[in-house]
Swiss-Prot record:
Sequence similarity: Belongs to the protein kinase superfamily. Ser/Thr protein kinase family.
Chemical reaction(s) catalysed: L-seryl-[protein] + ATP = O-phospho-L-seryl-[protein] + ADP + H(+); L-threonyl-[protein] + ATP = O-phospho-L-threonyl-[protein] + ADP + H(+)
Upper taxonomic lineage: Viruses, Varidnaviria, Bamfordvirae, Nucleocytoviricota, Megaviricetes
Keywords: ATP-binding, Kinase, Nucleotide-binding, Serine/threonine-protein kinase, Transferase
Enzyme Commission number, as recorded: 2.7.11.1
Domain of life: Viruses
SMART domains per record: S_TKc (SM00220)
SUPFAM superfamilies: Protein kinase-like (PK-like) (SSF56112)
Gene Ontology molecular function, alphabetical: ATP binding; protein serine kinase activity; protein serine/threonine kinase activity
Domain Protein kinase span(s) in chain numbering: 6-266
Record-annotated active site: 132
Protein name: Putative serine/threonine-protein kinase R436
Enzyme class: transferase
Annotated residues for binding of ATP: 12-20, 35
């Protein structure tokens, strides 16, 4: 199938509200990723909201929209992203085989986290929150790529009011979202999701809460203390537990997290060079 200057080559995701294809730019012959939104299953306003934020972001660690095409005849919107070669999501990174004594791998993971923090910091500085930070939405090749802004909000944009409710991926959603309170600081919930992502990476794919049922998971996150992080690096574990503190006001700022990670990266770098 060909529309405009793009062809659809391979379906990689099929959901009610959207389908995602690997495609080709027929002019440059470059691979692209194409999201197809259907107006029948999602309002045009909602689709425009989804593409607004990635279209205005400009950061080396954030995936940016390449193009979009509206097909009035079929009531579909085609959103085109660059295809990133040789990527792996953080979810598929084999951290369960991670040896805590391997300083090179530790340095690599900390460097990944610093790049993620850089992307979040840039977004927050521009009053944008991601709202679905998790290993699946972080891709790696030679650098980090934060993706999937379908749930993101711009905090100061009256055209697209901030969405309320339990939005996100359950295991990575902050307690205050489950509490269903009126006033939520969504920058703080992004920070919490970052903390759970760090916990996952540094605890061999384990998470601080475990439940078989959605309702049980909701209750645990809302009411129970998280299982203590045990990465083998007490300073990192202490930072992770602060980031996933149940009280949003006790969580460090994104700049404080970056400072701590850079400090730890310097220490690891010194040890690596010393051992050489």
């Amino acid at each position: 199938m060909i529309f405009s200057n793009y062809s659809l080559d391979k379906l990689i995701q099929n959901r009610k509200s959207k389908r995602i294809f690997i495609g080709t730019d027929t002019i440059t012959l470059q691979k692209v990723v194409i999201k197809i939104y259907d107006d029948k299953n999602k309002s045009k306003e909602s689709i425009l909201r989804d593409i607004h934020i990635p279209s205005i972001l400009n950061h080396p660690n954030i995936i940016k929209i390449k193009d979009y095409v509206e097909d009035l005849d079929s009531n579909k919107m085609y959103v085109i992203y660059p295809y990133i070669d040789n990527t792996i999501s953080l979810r598929n990174l084999p951290v369960d085989k991670f040896d805590v004594t391997d300083l090179f791998k530790l340095y690599y993971i900390i460097d990944i986290l610093i790049q993620v923090v850089d992307a979040i910091s840039y977004m927050h500085d521009n009053n944008i929150v991601h709202r679905d930070i998790k290993p699946d939405n972080i891709l790696l090749n030679d650098k980090v790529h934060l993706i999937d802004f379908d749930l993101s909000d711009q905090l100061d944009n009256p055209k697209f009011p901030v969405r309320k409710g339990t939005i996100g991926t359950p295991n990575f959603m902050a307690p205050e979202i489950w509490w269903k309170i009126n006033q939520v600081d969504y920058k703080k919930t992004d920070i919490y999701s970052l903390g759970i992502t760090m916990y996952y990476l540094l605890n061999k794919r384990k998470l601080p809460y475990k439940a078989k049922k959605y309702s049980e998971l909701e209750y645990q996150i809302a009411n129970h203390k998280p299982k203590i992080s045990n990465s083998g690096y007490p300073e990192l574990d202490k930072l992770i537990m602060k980031i996933i503190d149940k009280d949003p006001q006790n969580r460090p700022t994104i700049s404080e997290i970056k400072q701590k990670l850079n400090h730890f990266k310097t220490i690891v770098d010194t040890r690596v060079n010393f051992n050489e």
